[in-house]
Amino acid sequence: MKKRTKVIIGIGLSLLILVLGGLGFAGNYFYTLAIDAHSDKSVVFGNEEEDPKAVQASKDSYNEMMARDTKDVWMKNKDGYRLHAYEINQTGNKWIIVVHGYISEAKNMAEVANHFAEQGYRVLVPDLRSHGQSEGDSIGMGAWDSEDIVEWSKYILKQDSAASIALYGVSMGASTVMMASGNEQLPKAVKVAVEDCGYTSAWDEFSFQLDDLFGLPSFPALDAANFVTKLRAGYDLKDADALAAVKKKKIPMLFIHGDADDFVPTDMVYPLYKAAAGEKELMIVKGAGHGKSREIDPLAYWRKVDSYLGKYL
């Protein structure tokens, strides 16, 4: 082999190693930033101090929830993780599962849980895998979580064989609910669902965030991140696909989104609504940012949610 050819091959291999090393670094950085449940998420959410009034209101809602006939319940899922939920006991057979969002936890949904309890529901509020008191190290973006919601539905039926169940989720919880709606194992006792500001898929959401936060295209950064996620978390980001799931759903669904949402962009709700099989309704809340629809116009929000659920339970 000529010396010049060897030099060219050597340079090419060196560049390939550098590129692969860079992609490996980028993939691991993304995994740590977005999927590792224990890492700092301030790059995504910023370091703004929370409004003291909002913090106090959240504490008050939690205390109100725990002052009801509320207990901690536990379930071991098919992957061996011990999962936690709050269960608000009441009379009757009308149940609702309330699902929190990304890096949140069950206790942060206390305001919603209290509302449904006041409407006569028996309420189950799970900590999703790797959140709150539930075990796990990686955030599932709905891929795993939707399977856990199916199992929580079966848990309810063990407590109450005559149960009629609704699903309600916000943000990642909304996408989890949508993914669960298309799961063939979802019990027939689940009658209706409400999704508030869910994303079409984890892939689409992270593509948006890569561009919004870093000005990067999805290829090759997200492909590298997905490779690392498959290695370290054991799932493919493309499996967290709410858009594919709603095409197969067999239950009515109310889609809600704020028209000022710049975290899960409002444009995501339209293909979800269009693709959804079966009975469906769409509510766009003017001026509402991500997860803020019920704060911007609480009367209209709860009137719509309650009336929609009431048609099927």
Question: What kind of region is each of these model predictions?
Answer:
Residues 139-160:
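Alpha/beta-hydrolase active-site loop
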Residues 179-235:
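Hydrolase active-site cap/lid region
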Residues 248-250, 255-257, 261:
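Short beta-strand/loop motif that positions the catalytic acidic residue
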Residues 296-313:
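Catalytic active-site module of serine/aspartate enzymes centered on a nucleophile-bearing elbow/loop
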Residues 18-76:
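An N-terminal hydrophobic leader/cap segment in hydrolases
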Residues 102-115:
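The serine-hydrolase catalytic nucleophile loop
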Residues 113-135:
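Conserved alpha/beta-hydrolase
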Residues 273-291:
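Catalytic histidine neighborhood in serine/cysteine hydrolases
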